[in-house]
């Protein structure tokens, strides 16, 4: 959005368009463990949020992990994050991380996905 001002201007700003909201994925069989989700949040903020966005809400240049089916698999996520499977695509390798770290991040992302999915569903019910 580009804003231009005039000293004698009387115009008001148009409403800000709503943020593009992806539909988070959920696996109902996945049980989020709150302690792991809390640890995962700390790890996500430290290692992931710079690219994948605060609260796991990506800005568009990288995958929004709340809507990624890859994150539903601990093995696939570990292969990308620890083993560097997507380095050629710009995803850095975090070889120092352990599978337990990835599991904690996975719990955080599932927790965020469920919270955001609930918000989106509640919003859909109030606007119809």
Where are the language model's segments positioned?
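Residue-level detector of flexible, active-site-proximal loop/helix-junction positions
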Residues: 9, 72, 98
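Flexible coil segments in periplasmic/lumen-exposed cytochrome c-class electron-transfer proteins
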Residues: 14-46, 54, 89-128
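Active-site lining segments that contact anionic ligands and/or coordinate catalytic metals
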Residues: 2, 45-46, 60
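Blade-level signature of beta-propeller repeat domains, shared across WD40, Kelch, NHL, RCC1
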Residues: 1-21
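Solvent-exposed, flexible loop/coil residues
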Residues: 2, 69, 95-98
């Amino acid at each position: 959005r580009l804003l231009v001002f005039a000293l004698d201007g009387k115009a008001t700003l148009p409403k800000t368009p709503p943020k593009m909201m992806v539909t988070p994925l959920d696996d109902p069989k996945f049980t989020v463990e709150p302690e792991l989700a809390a640890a995962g949040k700390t790890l996500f903020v430290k290692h992931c949020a710079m690219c994948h966005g605060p609260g796991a809400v990506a800005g568009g240049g990288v995958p929004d992990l709340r809507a990624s089916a890859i994150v539903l698999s601990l093995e696939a996520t570990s292969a990308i994050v620890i083993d560097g499977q997507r380095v050629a695509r710009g995803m850095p390798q975090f070889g120092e991380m352990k599978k337990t770290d990835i599991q904690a991040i996975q719990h955080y992302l599932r927790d965020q996905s469920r919270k955001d999915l609930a918000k989106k569903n509640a919003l859909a019910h109030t606007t119809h």
